From Swiss-Prot:
Its EC number is 7.4.2.8. Belongs to the SecA family. Part of the Sec protein translocase complex. Interacts with the SecYEG preprotein conducting channel. Has a central role in coupling the hydrolysis of ATP to the transfer of proteins into and across the cell membrane, serving as an ATP-driven molecular motor driving the stepwise translocation of polypeptide chains across the membrane. This is Protein translocase subunit SecA. The gene is secA. The keyword ATP-binding applies. The lineage of its organism: Bacteria, Bacillati, Bacillota, Bacilli, Lactobacillales.
Length: 800
């Protein structure tokens, strides 16, 4: 282990040495840039752009571009980046993480790589954790980029698509991580290309990168809508299908008569309306053509009502308990609590059984931050604390963590932890130290891990008449103002972990002489990184400072991992005195080893999440790419549509003509052709079910499709309208099936753990089942596109 750490440390040093040489080059241009007039310095931007067009790379331009950005910062912002900030900027440009201590000027560091990468014209996204920081940085740093001739945009959730499109078209765009992810998902739900807002994802610099890529990595971004089903539609469809009669006649295509309204094919558990059933549906719902594009949702409700009433069996497939429909596991016979059939089938069964139909919001699109940010051409980030998660950044995001040296030596005092037997004795000691330091005017920042702890401490300070501010990470703008004053003489501030992050605490007059900012931690967090963030609030830019953590045996982390060893150790030293305190490096080491265990567990969980998510990621990319192809098409989608219809014909004909001719399911084949491809008249006059061969029938049906396509082209007359019709058909079907598939995959994932009991690897099972479900969905999409396209009657009022 020591060898590995040594290697990593040396790799860090080697990388920094390389950066030092580049920083020398940047600094060598300083005098030259300082000698230029404002106009000459501003003229560098178009000069760099034309050099890029002629083939120079961004790496070639780096020393000069960084020097230009640096000189412009001095003139516009009154700030001149230090050498260590140049090193940080190089790390960011290289697609790595620059670990820079609090107060070392991360925002200014980012200006150099942002300027350099924006010259390419492909867009740079500067990502922050909340909209207050995004808008603050866009206002402050935007002046610099605009002065240099770049365009700057701010992307926030309240904007219209038009405003967002403008923001994304800028050279530099400030945004939050969540808004970027949601915009990506929304872009892949549009029906016209002009509705999209994002450009291809080029380069992102993430501020507080550990918070976004580690702490929130597993948070899925979800866009959901009211599941399209109106409950009344399920009831209407249910009432209709309950009146229908099954056609139980044998598979004999010679008999043209329907003997019922629907037919069940038990080997495949499929059910479909016969011609009589289709006519009854048209009469019942007052329609001319059931399979018209406009009636797609109704057809879906009827299909599910048929399955619910005639294929799903009560007490075998499901049970009704306390007015609820519960699924029965077909393998174990057990009731599966909390699970629901997908694709509206559950609601259809609820309608069948007359119980309350549960509203469901349906996930229309979803992605995790891990998968969203991995799509950028180049990704980089800044934070004060990333080294502890170095392995995760390297393995998952292919980013190295480069620790950037501080501009001035750190002289802060980090004291050993103090351990108390109980929470009460610990908080009493915290208040005593606050009183003592407050009395001499030293500013104090107290970190807590929960709102409950903050309120407890606040109450105790009120009793002691010590004025203080409490931050709970709710109001970002107000909290930034409070945090900015937390370094003033006499200030006492209580903050939960994330509150006020991103805002520096600057020391007020006379505070250095009092020992700088005192930071008191009231509990160790399960992640060392969060503790380090709290410590890093003090001692910025070489200022004096003091930090100390107070622990008790009743703290969550100590209860989970400190165990009996620490308790025995404490008992031996404290003689059962509740107020007895132990100050020991051994305790600190014990706590840190507990934290390492938790971090390891959390990393394994995130890694596993990613492995599961990768299954969905691959499927999402396929669907979004196909969707984009449809949206992008300017001429005709015949080349997309025809193969889909041909594959459907092949699949259906093969399915119904397996084995010996005597076992062919001719009735089912005939029903498919009538309900999805042709009129009854055509089937009766043109297809001879006694003598046909499967291959000859396929060719005949291909020709039928070609003729139908040409008829529609002629009816629409305008190629643009034909293209619009094709897009309507494909996008409607794809979107509906994809939404249902997301739901089904989610249900699969929730149930897959149970398969682990059968000595099966749950991940492999999920991959296999997920792949099969995806293939099935593609087949269903092609089937529905076939039926919708072939059966649609052309009218000129298409709406997507």
């Amino acid at each position: 282990m020591a060898n590995i750490l040594k290697k990593l440390y040396n790799a860090d040093k080697r990388e920094l040495k390389r950066f030092e040489k580049i920083a020398d080059q940047v600094e060598s241009y300083a005098d030259q840039m300082a000698a230029l007039s404002d106009e000459e310095l501003q003229a560098k931007t178009p000069e760099f752009r034309s050099r890029i067009e002629k083939g120079e790379s961004l790496d070639d331009l780096l020393p000069e571009a960084f020097a230009v950005s640096r000189e412009a910062s001095k003139r516009v912002l009154g700030l001149y980046p230090f050498r260590v900030q140049i090193l940080g900027g190089i790390a960011l440009h290289r697609g790595n993480i620059a670990e820079m201590m609090t107060g070392e000027g991360k925002t200014l560091t980012a200006t150099m790589p942002v300027y350099l990468n924006a010259l390419s014209g492909k867009g740079v996204h500067v990502v922050t954790v909340n909209e207050y920081l995004a808008s603050r940085d866009e206002t402050e740093m935007g002046q610099l980029y605009r002065w240099l001739g770049l365009t700057v945009g701010l992307n926030v959730s309240t904007m219209s698509p038009e405003e967002k499109r403008k923001a994304y078209a800028c050279d530099v765009t400030y945004s939050t991580n969540s808004e970027l992810g949601f915009d990506y998902l929304r872009d892949n739900m549009v029906v016209y290309k002009e509705q999209m807002v994002q450009r291809p994802l080029n380069y992102a610099i993430i501020d507080e990168v550990d918070s976004i890529l580690i702490d929130e990595a597993r948070t899925p971004l979800i866009i959901s809508g009211e599941a399209e089903q109106a409950n009344a539609d399920y009831v209407r469809a249910d009432r209709f299908v309950k009146k229908l009669v099954e056609d139980k006649s044998d598979n004999d295509a010679d008999d043209d008569e329907d003997h019922g309204d629907y037919k069940i094919d038990w080997p495949t558990k499929t059910i479909s309306l016969t011609r009589t059933g289709i006519q009854k549906a048209c009469d019942h719902f007052g329609l001319k053509n059931l399979y018209d594009v406009e009636n797609q949702k109704l057809v879906h409700h009827i299909d599910q009502a048929l399955r619910a009433n005639y294929i799903m069996l009560k007490d075998i497939d499901y049970v009704v308990q306390d007015g609820e429909v519960l699924i029965v596991d077909s393998f174990t016979g057990r009731v599966m609590e909390g699970r629901r059939f997908s694709d509206g089938l559950h609601q259809a069964i609820e309608a069948k059984e007359g119980v309350k139909i549960q509203e469901e919001s349906q996930t229309q699109a979803t992605i995790t931050y891990q998968n969203y940010f991995r799509m950028y051409q180049k990704l980089s980030g800044m934070t004060g604390t990333a080294k502890t998660e170095e392995e995760e950044f390297r393995e998952i995001y292919n980013m190295e963590v480069i620790t950037i040296p501080t501009n001035r030596p750190v002289i802060r005092q980090d004291m050993p932890d103090l351990l108390y037997p109980t929470l009460d004795s610990k908080f009493k000691a915290v208040v005593d130290e606050i009183k003592e330091r407050h009395a001499k005017g030293q500013p104090i920042l107290v970190g807590t891990v929960s709102i409950e702890s903050s309120e407890r401490l606040s109450h105790m300070l009120d009793k002691e008449h010590i004025p203080h501010a409490v931050l709970n990470a709710k109001n970002h703008a107000k909290e930034a103002a409070i945090i900015m004053n937390a370094g003033q003489r006499g200030a006492v501030t209580i903050a939960t972990n994330m509150a006020g992050r991103g805002t520096d605490i600057k020391l007020g007059p006379g505070v250095k002489e009092l020992g700088g900012l005192a930071v008191i931690g009231t509990e160790r967090h399960e992640s060392r990184r969060i503790d380090n963030q709290l410590r890093g609030r003090s001692g910025r830019q070489g200022d004096p400072g003091y930090t100390r953590f107070y622990l008790s045996l009743e703290d969550d982390l100590m209860k989970r991992f400190g165990g009996d060893r620490v308790k025995d150790f404490l008992d031996r030293l404290s003689d059962n005195d509740d107020d007895k305190v132990i100050e020991s490096r051994l305790i600190t080491r014990q706590v840190e080893s507990a934290q390492k265990r938790v971090e390891g567990n959390n990393y394994d969980t995130r890694k596993q999440t990613l492995q599961y998510d990768d299954v969905m990621r691959i499927q999402r990319e396929i669907i979004y790419k196909e969707r984009m192809q449809v949206i992008d098409e300017q001429q005709s989608l015949k080349s997309v549509l025809m193969p889909m219809i041909h594959r459907t014909i092949d699949h259906q004909v093969d399915m119904f003509t397996q084995g010996d001719r005597s076992t062919w399911r001719l009735d089912s084949l005939r029903d498919f052709i009538v309900s999805s491809l042709a009129s009854e008249e055509y089937v009766d006059s043109e297809i001879d079910f006694k003598t046909f061969t499967p291959d000859a029938l396929k060719q005949q049906l291909y020709q039928l499709v070609e003729d139908n396509y040409q008829e529609k082209e002629a009816a629409l007359a305008d190629p643009e309208q034909m293209l619009e019709f094709e897009k309507v058909v494909i996008l409607r079907v794809v979107d509906e099936h994809w939404t249902n598939h997301i739901d089904a995959m989610d249900q699969l994932r929730q149930s897959i753990g149970l398969r682990g009991y059968g000595q099966l690897n749950p991940l492999v099972e999920y991959q296999d089942s997920g792949y099969n479900m995806f293939e099935e969905m593609i087949s269903d999409i092609e089937f529905d596109v076939t039926r919708l396209f072939m059966k649609a009657q052309i009218r000129n009022n298409l709406s997507r």
